[in-house]
Regions:
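A short beta-strand-loop-beta hairpin characteristic of the jelly-roll/cupin
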Residues: 27-54, 64
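A generic membrane alpha-helix/interface feature
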Residues: 38, 44, 56, 94-96, ...
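Residue-level detection of beta-strand scaffold positions
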Residues: 10, 52, 75-77
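Conserved metal-binding segment of the jelly-roll/cupin
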Residues: 17-18, 45, 52-72, 82-85
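A short glycine-rich, His/Asp/Glu-containing loop-to-beta-strand
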Residues: 1-25, 31
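A generic structural signal for short, solvent-exposed coil/turn residues
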Residues: 4-9, 35, 44, 60, ...
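Double-stranded beta-helix
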Residues: 67-119
Length: 119
């Protein structure tokens, strides 16, 4: 890890949404970049709708209240998310707020959905 110092300040994860699924509405101090690997949908950033599809990259600005939503009724959506969150944690700038929790029930017709095992 001596050669990977820059990676210590970047957090990366993959989100998978069932067809028609969506994540929680939330905000955090750190910015984020996400790359759409599969699917199509839109984000809401501070009330503004931003459509996206596979191959697109989006930036979530610092302190932006946002939500990711899949618009594909037939196929899952997969996004790669990258954040400088470890750096913000180190600086004690850890404010993160859930504005609206994700649904507890799956989207209609997606009761048996499971994220791909290959992720």
């Amino acid at each position: 890890p001596q050669a990977c110092k820059v990676a210590q300040s970047i957090e990366t994860h993959v989100d998978a949404f069932a067809p028609g699924g969506y994540g929680q509405k939330h905000g955090h101090m750190n910015s984020a970049v996400f790359f759409v690997l599969k699917g199509r949908g839109h984000d809401i950033h501070d009330g503004r709708k931003i459509p996206w599809e596979a191959g697109d990259a989006l930036i979530v600005e610092n302190a932006c209240v946002h939500q990711h939503l899949s618009d594909d009724p037939d196929d899952e959506t997969i996004v790669l998310i990258m954040k400088a969150k470890p750096l913000f944690l180190f600086m004690h700038m850890i404010f993160q707020k859930m504005v609206e929790f994700p649904p507890k029930e799956p989207a209609p017709g997606q009761e048996d959905y499971a994220p791909p095992a290959s992720l």
